[in-house]
Amino acid sequence: MIKLSKIAATVAFALTSGVALALPVVDDFSVSQTKIEDYTTADGAVWAVQAAGDDILGGFRDVYVRKDLLANDTALSVSALTSNGSFSYSESTQQAGIGVVRWDGISTGGEVNTNGLGSLDFTIFGSALNVLALAADDQSPLTFTVWSGVNKLASSFTILSQEGPGSYVFNFSDFVGADFTNVGALELQINNGTGSALDTRIDMVSVVPEPGTLALAGIALLGLGAIRRRKS
């Protein structure tokens, strides 16, 4: 169904713009990254090797984890893994930290490149960011930070997840002072270093189209379904 929805979104954009545009997907996590783990506190983050791919916003993805609690449990960790088309963040029993996925172009590790996306206009694609979670623990914080505008200032917004699968919509208007017509970098943080033993698995991060585009996408889905029925 997800693949069919992607096709419908592409068709809808072609209808509304008259030209072929890239699918409004930030990351479908089809490009894998090896598992990273942090067992100790107060010594910085553990970074994954940067991933590159056409299905990643800006062409590159940075991932890191940082353990904040408990300092004495050096046999237990917080970890992240991108495989089989999803991103997973996990905390061992009584451990807490953060997991971060960053889209800021080819820059690797360290400080965010606030203009790594080159002033991208997100409003071409829609009016909100959407996180499609395959699984999540109750009350796990999901925080988006966007660097935007002429000065690429940061603005953040947090949603608390519910247990199980879910779709979490971050309206552009929720980000105070943000200019989504001029985006330089984007980051998604899972947890906040306090709540312990929280796990989250994300299937896709995308831009939610405007209501009119969604309607066209539905029409496109019906058309594709009719074509498939005729072929069968």
Predicted regions and their residues:
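Short, threonine-centered small-residue motifs that mark membrane-proximal processing/anchoring sites
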Residues: 1-25, 194-221, 225-227
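N-terminal targeting leaders for non-cytosolic proteins
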Residues: 23-98
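Short beta-strands within extracellular/lumenal beta-sheet-rich domains
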Residues: 93-125
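A short beta-strand element within beta-rich, extracytoplasmic domains
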Residues: 124-136
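Residue-level detector of short, conserved catalytic/binding motifs and their immediate flanks
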Residues: 127-129, 142, 184-186
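Beta-strand acidic-aromatic groove motif in beta-rich domains, primarily in extracellular
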Residues: 139-147
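Terminal, low-complexity interaction segments
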Residues: 150-207
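Short, charged juxtamembrane terminal tails flanking transmembrane helices
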Residues: 229-232
